[in-house]
A protein has these predicted regions:
Chain A
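Class I SAM-binding transferase module
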Residues: 1-314, 320, 328-341, 345, ...
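Pre-Walker A adenine-sensing motif
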Residues: 324
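Conserved SAM/SAH-binding loop
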Residues: 348-349
């Protein structure tokens, strides 16, 4: 067995009370903790704001900043706000006391840690004022601590006098209220406390859609095994690994500072994570937004070609598809006499030509290849390849747009790779409709069919990224425009919750034998939410039949193994839509076609009516 | 009885089919109709888009524009789009045929009438594609014809095989879907068809909140009275008057062109409207948005002073209040010996001084008046009044801010008029807290208490106005910013539906005897929707006790008769909230106070969570 990789795991030791700051940091460090999580206010100092102006009381509620250097404050300490206050109390005095306490603490916490972490424990979903007081003008990260399962629910199992509202018992709703009131502020993240009880799988998946930044583990969820070691249950171990894989989150361990097993907890967590570590080949791309390519309108650059040519799977599948098509079209008896005409439309820097040559060689079929490419920069590469590497091959290079190409003969096989993350979004239908006239009546197109898929999803991280693209003269203004909120994006969506399974949207078949070709489409899809959640938009995928049973797919249920060329598509909604468990989600999707552009429009008609997004392609036209 | 006023009523004659355009216009004019409403497409010309390109069929589907002049097209004709098509059919061919038909007609209609009217009849709430096709890039007004009561509902009373969804039977939902999909486009308005059945009152009130531009009357809702005249039922007459008063709408009469009573219908409608006409003294202000004044921060100008001084009621009530206070403070036995000190804080151009002088004279009490005014321009007027008109009165003019004023003696009565539409929004609490130190221990403040009120409301017209304030480089962009959507406005709200009754929000008492004065406030209010509706924001009002039982109020249930100085306040929500009948609406309202400004924040927590509006007063601070 190979040595577990030295991945970086950051663990903070949570202290209920604190006597001596430097000693505590030293003690935690010796026990293999990177930092300590401490109450910001010192217990000894009671505060009374109503009777006493802040000025005189200010220096007395906590310790001095001079105890540590700025770097130590930032890296070694997570400040925790008082949780004994109630900003949402119906009693005005209690509420005002809470507001003043938290404002004072927040101000001091930001003084100490600048852009660092501040921890706030959430105790209910009645938190509008709390959200207002604690999130205004945040500079650092407000870690909102939420238990995975409401302690009252556990209680309710054996107590009948417990009073909690239905729905309000779900701690996700606490968090959802808080961050909705805070307008999905990117500075607000989750510190999710693992509880002894583990919720249903779908509830865990919903948490995976949230911006979880830390996992909180209490020493009391550790079990003692036969060897007297503290261990986590199998289920808790799996959770730990799952959250670390999704978020690369850090950990906060709640334990008594005198607990003899302090070192063990830290080492055990690291051990579990390291021994279950799997490198994600797409690491680094997580939830990063990209604008979909428009290879038809823009000429791709060398860097982009190179990235796509590196796909370990795609061109092998193309090669297999061409090989099978060649075998089907030319019986063994004719391999010496019959030459198949292959047209590669959109040759790029030659990967499909290479696939076609390999297919010909493997199937021992004779081929003549026409390579059509409109990008003059790619033509340079193709010419060089043909003149040097492929000079003994029967290849003709044509520098033109495939829609205007006038070949001297008709093709047996038309090969193209104009597929985008949503199938038709790089305009393969429009291109292939133009090129298919050069196909023999029995000729085949590779790919011969592509289908797009959609599902509604909760993706606050993506949503916040899009929102933050809005430029504003005044940083405090809230700006939402169609320019960003109605665009479409490509992203490796990791931190997202899929509200329902994908459904097919549009289908395109090549060659298209309809008497009048119309590539506009309109489809209504109906989904259902299993849990309360927030819908931020729709994830899009595609699959494509290259030839017979050879397909490529980024549909999550049928994803081609190793295929790396496409991330999912994301279609945002202008404003997040709060959805209740059991509610139906009805979405309309249009593919619109005009003389010089193609675009998608979308809106929802349930659970509530939305305006139509990307009207006339105002945010994102795809130029023909 | 006086002659009914010659109000302008515009009536169009709706023609099912049309043979000769000019004749028809002439015939209608002779029957006292201003215009005719005609099908845009000519029945003789069947259209088939799928088989035939538009170019060749284009000139054949309707009549030529040369038949009339542009002005005639605009003023004499309302074009009606085909209603035999179905843009939301599940059958792709039917849908595409519908799209092409309507696009062609719309294009031609806009060619004919430019910014004029185009009529479209709505037949169901399944209209996402219809809304998309007919509202994109609208230049004119799209009149969406909707029956007040669904004909199927009437049918269902005696047929059991009628199939319609529950909820979908409400034609308001058809309209609401349509305009929600069309993003509350200001170009889209309602042509409401009065049906024989009249819905419940609250449903009628909901329609009064919508942008109704025309009322459609079919000849078959006319009854024949004993004298063989066609008349409307009393209920229909009342509806007619109500809608005309609210909207000044025009009318479309559906009748057979050969109907002998054509002239009578037109004359009858005009007769009903004229004989029930009541001039609204506020006419011209309807639903116009104004930014609330900040008289503390900005110096009011002469025009504004003049407008407010014209209020026929306000200063009489002030005078009465001062008079009663004088009588209470100085018994008859002391009227020769005791002089009451009145301080008018915020003297403006003197109306309160005048009220105080009148009160003194009427009560025969002696007064000394200090007039405090910070606006140097108003000081000019006040000096002139004191030196000329009031030179024998005991009046001292002090040119300063009332919060800094240091008077030589303490006052019996402190009179001010710093009230805004939401009571405290012109900072009366802050001002009076500063001035009240000059009051004798038993002195009184006029006003002595003010209370603000709120209720949720549907006000698409106001909402659209606010939305259209957003400036955009590209007219097609959808832009929503806090700058406008989180501001507060003052408006004479006529075209609005009040979702629930107002409730009290904040209360301020003067003088404020709290040991520590805190003018920040936080209140949570709970409302309930009786009908499906859309919430665009909250209407705000106030009432104020001047002295004892003398009050001024703009609360709709207790509105002081004739009081004209204040319109309602409007607090918008960033995005309209679709509300279902029976749903609870929970809103939080904050009054926030900082060293140099005061502002309101608000959000809703039910039926769904909204972000907090006007955070830190980003859209609308009220400067101290």
């Amino acid at each position: 067995m190979s040595e577990p990789p030295q991945i970086k795991v950051s663990i903070s030791l949570h202290q209920d009370t604190l006597y001596e700051l430097e000693t505590a940091i030293e003690h935690a460090a010796k026990s293999n903790y990177n930092s300590i999580t401490i109450p910001l206010a010192h217990r000894r100092f009671e505060r009374e704001f109503v009777q006493e102006p802040l000025k005189t009381g200010h220096n007395r509620f906590t310790r001095s900043d001079l105890l540590l250097s700025s770097t130590q404050w930032l890296n070694r300490v997570i400040c925790r706000l008082s949780c004994g206050v109630d900003c949402d109390s119906e009693d005005d005095n209690v509420r005002k006391q809470g507001e003043s306490t938290l404002r004072q603490e927040l101000s001091y916490a930001e003084h100490l840690v600048q852009n660092g972490y501040i921890l706030l424990r959430l105790k209910s979903g009645n938190c509008a004022n709390l959200a207002r007081v604690t999130t205004v003008g945040l500079k650092g990260v407000l870690l909102v601590e939420v238990p995975m399962v409401n302690p009252k629910v556990a209680q309710a199992n054996w107590r009948s006098d417990a009073d909690y509202e239905c729905g309000a018992d779900d701690t996700w709703n606490w968090w959802n209220n808080f961050r909705s009131y805070a307008d999905f502020d990117t500075h607000v993240k989750v510190a999710l406390e693992f509880t002894a009880d583990i919720p249903e799988k779908r509830e865990i998946y919903r948490w995976l859609g949230e911006p979880v930044d830390a996992v909180v583990l209490s020493s009391n969820i550790f079990l003692t095994n036969a060897n007297n070691y503290a261990v986590l249950s199998k289920a808790h171990q799996e959770l730990l690994v799952l959250f670390y894989r999704t978020f690369g989150c850090h950990f906060i361990v709640k334990a008594n500072p005198d607990d003899k097993r302090l070192v063990h907890y830290a080492d055990y967590i690291k051990y579990i994570l390291r021994s279950n570590y799997k490198k994600d080949p797409m690491q680094g791309y997580d939830d990063l937004l990209e604008i979909p390519l428009q290879p038809l309108y823009d000429n791709l650059d060398s860097f982009t070609y190179e990235v796509f040519e590196k796909d370990p799977v795609k061109y092998i599948l193309y090669q297999n598809a061409i090989e099978e098509a060649l075998r089907d079209r030319v019986p063994s008896s004719e391999i010496q006499t019959r030459t198949s005409i292959i047209m590669v439309v959109g040759g790029g820097r030659g990967p499909l030509v290479r696939a076609a040559l390999n297919a010909a060689s493997k199937s021992k079929r004779m081929v003549k290849i026409y390579v059509v490419e409109k990008n003059p920069n790619a033509i340079v590469t193709l010419s060089a390849l043909i003149n040097e590497l492929w000079k003994d091959k029967n290849i003709e290079l044509i520098s033109t747009d495939m829609r205007e190409f006038e070949p001297p003969e008709k093709a047996d096989i038309l090969v193209s790779e104009l597929l985008g993350s949503f199938g038709d979004n790089e305009l393969s239908p429009e291109c292939l409709d133009g090129a298919q006239k050069h196909l023999k009546p029995d000729g085949v197109s590779i790919p011969c069919k592509s289908t797009s898929y959609l599902n509604p999803c909760m993706a606050p991280k993506i949503y916040s990224q899009i929102r933050s693209m809005e430029k504003s003269l005044h940083a405090k203004d809230r700006i939402v425009t169609s320019r960003y909120m109605e665009g479409t994006y490509v992203a490796y969506l990791k931190n997202a919750y899929h509200i329902d399974n994908p459904q097919a949207v549009f289908e395109f078949v090549h060659p298209n034998l309809d008497p009048i070709i119309d590539n506009s489409r309109y489809k209504t899809l109906r989904f259902k939410a299993q849990l309360d959640c927030v819908m931020h938009g729709f994830c899009g995928y595609f699959d494509s039949v290259l030839y017979k049973d050879i397909t490529i797919s980024i549909h999550p249920f049928t994803h081609t193994k190793g295929l790396a060329s496409w991330f999912s598509m994301f279609f945002p909604l202008t404003e997040p839509v709060q959805v209740r468990a059991g509610e139906e989600i009805v979405v309309n999707f249009w593919r619109c076609v005009a003389s010089h552009k193609v675009w998608y429009e979308w809106n929802i008609t349930a659970p509530r009516q939305s305006h139509i997004h990307n009207v006339q392609g105002r945010a994102q036209p795809i130029w023909k």
